[in-house]
Structures are given as structure tokens and as C-alpha cells.
Amino acid sequence: MRISKESIVKRFLRYVSLETTSDPSSEETPSSDKEWDLAHLLCFELRSMGLAASVDDHCYVTATIPAVGMTSQPVIGLIAHMDTSPDASGRNVKPRIVHYEGGEIPLDETGTITLTPQKFPELIQYVGQELIVTDGTTLLGADDKAGVAAIMELANHLTTHPEIPHGEIRIGFTPDEEIGRGASLFDVEGFAADFAYTVDGGAVGELQYENFNAASATIHCHGLNVHPGDAKGKMINAMRLAMDFDSTLPDQRPSTTEGREGFYHLTAMSGTVEEAELEYILRDFDSEALEERKDTLLRTAAAINSRYDDERITVTVRDQYRNMLECLLYRMEIVDHAAEAMKRLGIEPITSPIRGGTDGATLSHRGLPCPNLFAGGLNFHGIYEYLPIPSLVMAAETLLEIVTTEVRS
């Protein structure tokens, strides 16, 4: 391997020590001031490598690695996000390295929280490898600090080995990807790449150029509260309206769907007798099917409202991101270039669609074609997240192979 295992692991551990949880309740970019800490650290490290790097007013980090020899090649962008998911704590992450010999891995001090192949069958693939795991109280942050570390280690390798030929490389690190806003203020024109890759995938080999179309929805339920002792025929309980609404939807949920099947996902609920609110995300690979899901919400609300003299349920839908496939169908040489790089390293590309989204989806629709590459981590967004060290090294090796090989038109 050309990439230093010791260096990239130290780099990853340094980055996950900084809390960068994004905040979905904030309208600012970045949504959390904590994201600045990693942004400034990355900018400092890039400049220490002798590269031109900057952080803009919205916490986007960009840098350039000038071409060496291969000046006629397209400018390739490499992008990862700095924030971690608000689904689990990212504060005071205490990673540890274990040599996995099979069976269960105790995460917490008492051994009551364990990472096991019974819960996560893919774990068995990593017998004999070193894994970075959590202490059972936080997520790890491999999503996407593994991608950040892989890109930074590539930059370190190329700047310490100036004899290696490569084309011009643009580096971008974004805030707020986990709350769907990572690419919204990204300066595509200023980035000036011909195409790019996000490094935000999971297991070794993942190469993704298709993702969900996505929308979110807020369902507001208006009740009528009176004293429960005199409520017959009068009280309308907003929480029961909410329960009725959710139970009426098709049973197409994350826990019951797979592959190319879309879903309705209830992500939050709150309420009193007077007012209740449901938050959903809607996902589908087919844009028309996503529109049908939106219509289903409206029809469900209308059906419940028809039982009352007043409009008791209102639905607000917001589009989030679109499937990048419609952009990349005409630029498949970008996907092929990455696939060929993987194959030269003995990796079989895995081209299954992303049951989620990446910054690359939005960037592709903004004119920067941007498929997604693996970063190596697994079980994102929770305490069972882990990162096989060989996978992290291979992510950086793949980037090195991509940027040092001529792109075929």
C-alpha cells in the first residue's frame, strides 16, 4: 500500500475528537458553530501542506492541488462533509481500536452494549482486521470523517511525493450534509472542477450514481380541548388525529422496504390534545412515485378532514434533493473511471443505488456531475458505527488511483 495506515488513522481519530453535529432546527449555515472547529483545522492542515486553501463565510472549505505533469487532464473534485448526524450524540467521541477475532465486541465498560454479527451480519467479513469502534455512548463519525480523512491523506501523500504525476485536484469540505443542506451554498462555479466525487459511501467497493428523490413533510393536527369530564361529542384530540393519520398511510416504511422500494418515514412526533405535529421524510427512486407519495399525504388529510366541520389536518411538503441518475446517464465515463481504478486495486465495484442522498445529488443537478465513492464505515448514525482500518486505507488508495490515471473521454 502507498498510503500510510498510521498517518490516516491518526488523522481520522483527530477529526472525530471534534464535535460537528449539525442542527436541523437552525436556519443558519453552518447550522452549528461547532462545525467551524473542524473547518479551520482542515484549512490549517491544508495550508501546512503548502496548498492554497480557504474557508468561506458559510463554513465551506476549498483547496487546490496543482497538476504535476498531467496538465491536460480534467480537473477532478473530491468532496466530503464535515458534520455528523443529529440522530446520535457526536460529543466526546471515544473511539478505540480492536482486533476483531469473531464473535461479539463489547463497546461500553460493562459489556452490556455489544457489536455482534447476529445484529450486523456483515461484521463477519472483517474477522482478522483492526476496527475502530465507539464506546457505546456516541456515534463514531466515520460518516463522513472517514471521507474527510481519506481526502486529506491523499493530499498529504501527493504533497510529500511531488514526483507523482496527477491532474489538478480540487478539494471541498461541506457543512450540514446530514440535514440536507450540504450543497445548497456550495460555490460550484468557483470550485471550477470538470467533475467530482463525494467520498461518503460505506463498504469497500461502493460506487453510486443513483439515489433517492427526497421530500419532507410536516403534518399539523388541530384539536379541540375541553374538560375531559364534559368532553363527549365535543373534544377532538389532536394526538389521536395524528395517530389516525399515520396508521392510514401504506405500510411502506424503512423497516419494511429494501432495494428500489421507496417509503414514508415518521421521524418525529409531538403533541397535546390541542395541537400535534408529525414530521416525515418521503423517499423514492422514481420522481413520479415520489409525487404520488406527496399526493397520498394530501388525500389522507382530506379523508380525515371530511369527518369534521373544520380543517383539522394540514400538510406542508418540501422538496429536498433529486436522483442524480438523470444527470449522470450522459456522463458515465466519470463512473467508469472510478470503477476501473477500483478494479486495478483488486476491488469489485458495487453499484447499488443509494437508499439516501449525498451532496453529490444536489451538485449534479447544479452542473457538477458527482457520483459517490466508498469511505469504509458501516452502521452510520448510531452507537454501533464502526470503521475497518483496511477499508479506510483502501478509500485513500482508490482516490490516489483515480487522480493519477488518465481519464478516458
Task: Describe the role of every protein-language-model region.
Residues 71-168, 173, 193:
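Active-site metal-coordination/substrate-binding segment of hydrolases
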Residues 240-256, 263-265, 312, 322-374:
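Active-site-adjacent substrate-binding region
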Residues 5-33, 133, 225, 321, ...:
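N-terminal capping segment at the start of a domain
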Residues 123, 129-142, 176-305, 311-313, ...:
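Midchain, well-structured core segments that form catalytic/ion-binding scaffolds
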Residues 133-141, 348-352, 382-383:
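Short pre-catalytic strand/loop immediately N-terminal to key active-site residues, enriched for Gly-Thr
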Residues 24, 56, 163-168, 251-265, ...:
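Flexible, glycine/charged-enriched surface loops at secondary-structure junctions
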Residues 8, 37, 236-253, 288-300, ...:
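His/Asp/Glu-rich mid-to-C-terminal helical/loop segments that flank catalytic regions of hydrolases
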Residues 27-73, 77-83:
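A non-catalytic alpha/beta surface segment that caps or lines the substrate-entry region
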